[in-house]
UniProtKB/Swiss-Prot annotation:
One CC-aspect GO term: mitotic spindle
Gene designation per UniProt: Poldip2
PANTHER family: F-BOX ONLY PROTEIN 3 (PTHR14289), POLYMERASE DELTA-INTERACTING PROTEIN 2 (PTHR14289:SF16)
Annotated GO MF terms: DNA binding; protein-macromolecule adaptor activity
Name of the protein: Polymerase delta-interacting protein 2
Protein species of origin: Mus musculus (Mouse)
Transit peptide: first to last position: 1-21
Length: 368
């Protein structure tokens, strides 16, 4: 087993928090970044040790979380794998993997331009590459400390009644990319505080990791697969701002003698530079298979105008869209402001809104 002792430092009475690391593998820490959009520098040592009092920031409490393992370069993490999120810093546990198609326009831009794709509205054709994501549970103790940098601490579903606009959410459920996972081990039999942890996972010290799926988890995954499934991920970088979009089909409802199709989309904004920028505006174009084209403009996103800095480089949020057609496309731009008052536009990669063609009945909420 590799690694470094993971500790969490919570600032009493504030939302700022960090983790300090002590590693057994040279002076370089196993993980260099993490936390609520980015952490302060980590402490390292050539041998495993506990941090001395002089390393502790005044007013913060250190507590042992576990021991880091070497992140997997190949293969998948198993059900029950504990981890720290490398970008948002929360503790979590893997429930099961998803095999997604990643459409990376940054990779495509390095290849010769191909014929325009009408569905992509003038953009180059991008080939999808298989990439692993995971359905995870977030430790409830950490949710308050990431709420300023991530608005996706819950997965939303259509409600199980006739109101076509009613949604409900399962808090502490998230989707995580393979490279976001910093795996660790813990001797605690209940290391993650979430109401579904013990309902979904069983402690088995003979296994590695020592948490195995209960039949409840397998049944839940099977019944809700159409409404949980992550299939496509779209990514593009403009002027060192990377935008990642993940759309999810939520189902169809009947309203006023017509069908209304719903999608949820998750967006992560990442500042890959050290310059501070602030999101000011969004500009969406929404095309429906029925032939309509809608333009949506507004200030910020989800009521916020997040600042992306070297210390907190990422922001993530979810929103929803409905169409009176079974498919469509979305694309657009985010307008950012620099400290000198100048502005620049960042492209949102175009993505498809596809419904489940095999859907026989609309979802009736989450099945247990």
């Amino acid at each position: 087993m590799a690694g470094c002792v993971a500790r969490r430092a919570l600032a009493v009475g504030s939302r700022w928090w960090s983790r300090s690391l002590a590693t057994t593998r040279g002076s370089r820490p196993l993980c260099a970044v993490g936390g609520a959009g980015g952490l302060p520098p980590v402490a390292t040592a050539t041998t495993r040790r506990h941090l001395s009092s002089r390393n502790r920031a005044e007013g913060k409490v250190l507590e042992t979380v576990g021991v880091f393992e070497v992140p997997k370069q190949n293969g998948k993490y198993e059900t029950g794998q504990l981890f720290l999120h490398s970008v948002f810093g929360y503790r979590g546990v893997v429930l099961f993997p998803w095999q997604a198609r990643l459409y990376d326009r940054d990779v495509a831009s390095a290849t010769p331009e191909k014929a325009e794709n009408p569905a992509g509205h003038g953009s180059k054709e991008v080939k999808g590459k298989t990439h692993t994501y995971y359905q995870v549970l977030i430790d409830a103790r950490d949710c308050p400390h990431i709420s300023q940098r991530s608005q996706t601490e819950a997965v939303t579903f259509l409600a199980n009644h006739d109101d076509s606009r009613a949604l409900y959410a399962i808090p502490g459920l998230d989707y995580v990319s393979h490279e976001d996972i910093l795996p660790y081990t813990s001797t605690d039999q209940v290391p993650i505080q979430h109401e579904l942890f013990e309902r979904f996972l069983l402690y088995d010290q003979t296994k590695a990791p020592p948490f195995v799926a209960r039949e409840t988890l397998r049944a839940w995954q099977e019944k809700n697969h159409p409404w949980l499934e992550l299939s496509d991920v779209h990514r593009e970088t403009t002027e060192n701002i990377r935008v990642t979009v993940i759309p999810f089909y939520m189902g169809m409802r009947e309203a006023q003698n017509s069908h209304v199709y719903w999608w949820r989309y998750c967006i992560r904004l990442e500042n890959l530079d050290s310059d501070v920028v602030q999101l000011r505006e969004r500009h969406w174009r929404i095309f429906s298979l029925s032939g309509t084209l809608e333009t949506v403009r507004g200030r910020g996103v989800v009521g916020r105008e997040p600042v992306l800095s070297k210390e907190q480089p990422a922001f993530q949020y979810s929103s929803h869209v409905s169409l009176q057609a079974s498919s469509g496309h979305m694309w657009g731009t985010f307008r950012f402001e620099r400290p000198d008052g100048s502005h620049f536009d960042v492209r949102i990669p175009p993505f498809s809104l596809e419904s489940n063609k095999d859907e026989k009945t609309p979802p009736s909420g989450l099945h247990w």
